[in-house]
Amino acid sequence: MEFIDYQAFETAPDNNDKSGTNGEVSLPEPVSRLNISSFSLDYKPLKDNFKLPSILSNVETSLLQTKADVQDDTAMAQKLKKDTSNLYDRMSDYVDLSIQNFGTKNIKDSTPIPEATTRKTLVEPSSIDLEKSNEILAKKLSKVLNEYDTSYHHTIKLRKSLKILEKNRDKLGISEEKLISPDYIGTLARKSLRTDLETQLLKDHVTVLEDFKPIVRRIKRLAAPVQQIENIGEEILKNDKETFSQKYISDIDDCRNHLLKLEIKKKILKALQSKFTLNQLEDDLIENGPLKEEIFDIVDKLTKMKEHATYLLALPNSKAGEVLIKQTNITLDTINKKISNYLIDYMYTFESNSNMGTKHVIDPTERNLALFQKGLVYLSNDIQYYDDFLKRVTTMRSKTLLDEFLSQFGTTSELSTTISSSEDPVRYIGDVLATIHTMIANEVDFVKSLFKFTSEDMDKSSSMIINNNAQYFDGLDLKLVNDIVQYLANSCKLRIEQVIRFEENKVINFEITQLLDLYSSMFVNKGIRDDNPLVLHLIQLRDISEKKIINSLTKQLAETENTQISSPDLLPPQWLSDYLNSITELFDHVERLYGGKRFSKDDIDSDKYMFPYDTLKTVIEEPFMTSLIKQIKDSYPLAKKKEEIRIVMLTLQINCFEMINFRLQPYSLSIFSYDESCKHILENIQHTLDETVEKLQKLQISLLFERTGLNMYYNLMNMIFPIDSIQDEIDYDMYMSLVDNPLMSLENLEKNIHEKLNDYLPQALPDFQDNLLIKLTSPSIADDVCEICFRTLTDFYCIFRRILKHLYPDNKEKVEAILNFTESEFKTLAGV
């Protein structure tokens, strides 16, 4: 309908004109389009309420002026068309410019305003003209439709086309008002619609033709070979009737055989190419592609190529094999470097995420983790890159751990520190070791999530590599953990040693040794080796702390080495009591450590036990059995000459050893049951105490016999036959030789015994208890000494009285007068 222009029908045709076909009215030709390219774009747009001015003087003047401006309007319209995307907008601008241009050129101030009738005639069309125009349009449409193929098939296609237009009305930007508009804008809208439809149709056709391009190119490419085959066929057909000679047949066979050989060579070369070369895609993936599964397939292929290339070395000319192996090694080195860079980037990415506070533990199901582990497996084929990567990991992780550890000792309030001061040495060291243990535990979990895997977790090719390089993967996670945490050893040792060096309290040092033992065991349980510097430093620190305890005890003894320990009350010196307090306090901690008051060498770790025989010998046996006895003897230099001083010395020694034995005896089933040597130390102390008590008893017996006058006779009779060996009266005859001894005469007996015995015996028991044995701190020892002394005296008195009666049977009354106490009376007075 683009040829229908309503401006062509402003004047109704003559009814008498019958020149048209079938009496139809002859329609005028459409007017030519206006040339609007000459219009200038430098104008001010009209206001929306613009009205056509009615001040024209006459119609003819206006029409003449309009014709004069047609050429300028055409140029302006073409320029405007280039700057406006929408046809309707272009036409609206064109109308506005036309009216503006029209008004500026033709409107005069002096032009009289026409009357209403004239204005209506010029501006408003009459109803008669509109009806005539519609009639002409209807006839034209009828003619177009009548000329169209009216078959059912074409009707369906027309209807379908109209429906498609209606369906895509919004997409095509169709405006019905513009399309049916009877003015020039409607004409342009209809032409624009047709242009758009044709353009879209051309695009669809081009799209279809694009699909045929490969086919056309292939046909063109095959045209020449096909033409050549066709020409050869025609030539063969021409010579079909001619007789071929044997030579031609032989040539054909030779050519065919040569062709077969070439085909075989081609197949061999292609097989060799596929076996010993990489394709372009694989080369590009190696040089420019990221690390992914295809890279490992290429590595497997290169490994096989290298293996097969070794067969080429057996050829007479081995240069091809050498070059191939060299090139393969270069390519493998490139891939290994790519894998190494990926693994390092992966670790750095993890470090960055950790520093930003993101998730610290890697998800084992993560795809990148599987790629990381597979890359590590393949990297193990190149030991240099493999070792370099592990060193980078060790350096990176150790620096992170060391920074984290040192950050715990910050002093600013902004830092969240767990270790702030060393006011409590045990707590401080415990916090230090607990921090390290936590870091080790976290590091073990992290390293295991990355580096602990088996051949069962991998695919077939990776499993083969793991099995071939088992020495690199067995215990890899623990090896890395040990290499990483060993960098904490020096910092840990420095922090703990500075506390131990200045700590003098033996109990605190002992608790420190137990902490060090505990955490060294915990570190070992986490996979840290015994020979790791961290564990070795803890053992060294434990030894230092233990030596501090021993040195503190020996120093405590050394300060009292030259002091006099004699005192009027014969009590143990204060330093001995303090020393025993220190020892027993340590023993109590040891018993609590091992869970009770009974344990042996089989129940504890010998390497960590603090009081083996050597230590007990240093802190118990030598100070008491040697130094203490020497000090006591040095305090009483006249003890060898005077029995009274010797008794005082023995009393003091008994008091000291009794206190030592009393304080150490509770540990007989624990500390001193560690082994036989330890038991022997406590037995020696008990033996020394018993021996000293026995010496005191002998001195007290001698003193008692001397004060009763029986001492000389006691010694005399024991020289002949021991009093303790007498069993019955027959043994009395052993002393018959004493009758001839002047000392045994009744007169001398009365002179030497009677008076002393009667004077001292009644007060002997109180004298012993209140004077001689009162300074023994142990009541049981004092009672035992007193009882033994008086029992010995009583036994001798009774036997001596019987022997005298046996020796002097005729003077029994005289004997009874000299030894005037009966046996029962004597026992009563002696308290036996």
From Swiss-Prot:
Family classification: Belongs to the COG6 family.
Source organism per entry reads Candida glabrata (strain ATCC 2001 / BCRC 20586 / JCM 3761 / NBRC 0622 / NRRL Y-65 / CBS 138) (Yeast)
Question: Tell me, what is an example of a GO biological process annotation in this record?
Answer: cytoplasm to vacuole targeting by the Cvt pathway
Question: What gene codes for this chain?
Answer: COG6
Which keywords does this Swiss-Prot/TrEMBL entry list? Golgi apparatus, Membrane, Protein transport, Transport
Q: In its UniProt entry, what is this protein called?
A: Conserved oligomeric Golgi complex subunit 6
- What topology in the membrane does the UniProt record assign? Peripheral membrane protein
- Give a short account of what the protein does: Acts as a component of the peripheral membrane COG complex that is involved in intra-Golgi protein trafficking. COG is located at the cis-Golgi, and regulates tethering of retrograde intra-Golgi vesicles and possibly a number of other membrane trafficking events.
**Quick one: where is this thing mainly located?**
Golgi
Protein's cellular compartments = Golgi apparatus membrane
The record's GO CC annotations read: Golgi membrane; Golgi transport complex
The superkingdom of the source organism is: Eukaryota
Q: Which InterPro entries does UniProt cross-reference here?
A: COG6 (IPR010490), COG6_C (IPR048369), COG6_N (IPR048368)
Keyword Zinc carried by entry: no
